Amino acid sequence: MERRQSICPQGRLPLYSAVVRSTSDIQASVRFASRHNLRLVIKNTGHDSAGRSSAPHSFQIHTSLLQNISLHKNFIARGSTTGRGPAVTLGAGVMQWQAYVHGAKNGYTILGGECPTVGAVGGFLQGGGVSSIHSFTRGLAVDQVLEYQVVSANGDLITANEDNNQDLFWALKGGGGGTFGVVTEATVRVFSDDPVTVTSTKIEAAAANVLFWKEGVHELLRLLQRFNNLHVAGQLVISAPTKDSLQAGLELHFANLTDETQAIQLLRSEARALETHGISASTSVRVQRKASSELRMKPDVYPPHYGILEASVLISAATFHANDGPALIASKLSGLTLKPNDILFTSNLGGRVSENTAIEIALHPAWREAAQLVTLVRVVEPSIEGKLSALNNLTARDVPILYSIDPAAKISYRNLGDPQEKEFQTRYWGADNYARLAATKAAWDPSHLFMTSLGVGSEVWDAEGICRKRRGFRAKASSLIGM
């Protein structure tokens, strides 16, 4: 509790939180917030560095206890008579690691991310959902959604799928969490938990060695480009173990392969030596009998005792697969000064992500034409001054470097975006999709009960979503996207 004489307020934490245990609890909480005109925020696991699940002077609905998991042999969506194949229904509080463990026991896996503590159907799914292992071969997480159960702004429980409330269903497939309603559960396609062989190529050099980027990172990006063309997905991770050193690792994921020797031979047949450039290199290989095991072993992106900030950019297939693509990208990324615990990594798009054009999603159309997502994770010092400095440096220095890789596009991922992104409407969704999202928001939540930072409709509120600006939402949104 705050002392009355204290000049330090509560901050961006909610004053009250309803830790819900059922859908009826959520309905009662939403109606309570609406009746009393409260600033409402939705928290799933809180795995969010941009403050979307918190706000000052607010009332929070915390969904972490909704832990139901139901497996379906042939899921039939409400209002339909057609089976959609194997699927699983996950409650709003189920985390990725829990879904992976349940799947491993029952012979399936979902399209999920690497961080085990991320909620499987919260902001990850509603924001798009990228998997370093599965997206190249399966698509985005939102490509797998068959049905949502949602508590709307008036407290009703709504089914959203291809046959019911199609506008809401579309908006929840990339329009962002905590914006259109409270998702209580989602049903997503499942896949067989097939084996994967993972090769790992690691390089390390002194931070002062400019050839680390020009030769080392360039070579790893060239390998990633080459193996993508061979239908093999991969992920590049760059970090600074100490203030005087840099390291990078490229993992290639050979789906449905259990022959270590074959994987290593393929890698070595394409790789070039780097030792002559003062760069140490090593290669290893491992076989996972179940792909979910690879995801379950990944560490969380959050370093202990620190907060983080994130920024991201899409790299188009045209840029990445150009002859000079790897060299260009390595050169641009070298402008980012990495400190200990900072991380720079790619997520493999292209492949099935590009092929799933028949599936309508709310994300920016450029996702279907992208080859990679590049994400920068900055560690934030535990002080007010440190946080402000890191945030301002991210916006003023880091993001322009990321956007310079593909300057004609400048598309970002809201789930991993700059918390101060000024052009979020066009960066995250594009003008046409944002206009459609704004119309859906107006239809389902005309009073803006649900509001998140840099979410659909947030431009007509102040930075914390407390005070509404004078202009109407539709008019303001239209002017911002040039309509």
From Swiss-Prot:
Residues 10-193 form the FAD-binding PCMH-type domain. Disruption phenotype: Abolishes the production of clavine alkaloids but also of more complex alkaloids such as ergopeptines. Accumulates N-methyl-dimethylallyltryptophan (Me-DMAT) and traces of dimethylallyltryptophan (DMAT). It comes from Claviceps purpurea (Ergot fungus). GO terms for biological process: indole alkaloid biosynthetic process. It is an enzyme of class 1 (oxidoreductase). PROSITE patterns: FAD_PCMH (PS51387). InterPro entries: BBE, FAD-bd_PCMH, FAD-bd_PCMH-like_sf, FAD-bd_PCMH_sub2, FAD-linked_Oxidoreductase, Oxid_FAD_bind_N. The keyword Oxidoreductase applies. Keywords: Alkaloid metabolism, FAD, Flavoprotein, Oxidoreductase. Belongs to the oxygen-dependent FAD-linked oxidoreductase family. The gene is easE. Pathway: Alkaloid biosynthesis; ergot alkaloid biosynthesis. FAD-linked oxidoreductase; part of the gene cluster that mediates the biosynthesis of fungal ergot alkaloid. DmaW catalyzes the first step of ergot alkaloid biosynthesis by condensing dimethylallyl diphosphate (DMAP) and tryptophan to form 4-dimethylallyl-L-tryptophan. The second step is catalyzed by the methyltransferase easF that methylates 4-dimethylallyl-L-tryptophan in the presence of S-adenosyl-L-methionine, resulting in the formation of 4-dimethylallyl-L-abrine. This is FAD-linked oxidoreductase easE. Pfam families: BBE, FAD_binding_4.
